[in-house]
Amino acid sequence: MQDVKQLTVNAIRVLSAEAIQKANSGHPGLPLGAAPIGYAAFTNMTFNPKDTAFDNRDRFILSAGHGSMLDYALYYLFGFGLTKEDIMNFRQLGSKTAGHPEYGVCPGVETSTGPLGQGIANAVGMAIAEDYLANKFNKEGFPIVDHYTIALCGDGCMQEGIENEAASLAGSYFFLTWFPSLFIL
């Protein structure tokens, strides 16, 4: 008998492959290869799928937005309100599951991503905001703001100028709470 982790990773891969095949369009590499990374992130993050705007939630940014089926499979399996029909309508006009994640369209998406590297810059901005809020509101013994921002990016993201600028900015702030979870695939 396989364990729950492997079954879930396999489900992410199968859902992604089925939706991409049905749409006859999409990028299967990232959701198939990064399924274990997505599973590990989501099983260790703080979030509430019934309240996706919960202030102290951890943020997951898929910078390599072309691999959006990874996001959608995770949102489906972790109860964010997507249906199997939503998954099978991947890349269809008017669908919640567009070719790139769109903020405000699909529950759970933290920011729209498309241009490579953009998600890294968004994650750095979110981490700066988190750091500011933590310094303003946290008191000893009362960590009101203590969430994390996680960015999953591909090699294409790391080759863009926007990533270099964002990484330079992040380095200048010496983030302690924004652990650089920039997985290079």
Question: What would you call each of these model-derived segments?
Answer:
Residues M1-I12:
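N-terminal hydrophobic or amphipathic helices/low-complexity stretches enriched
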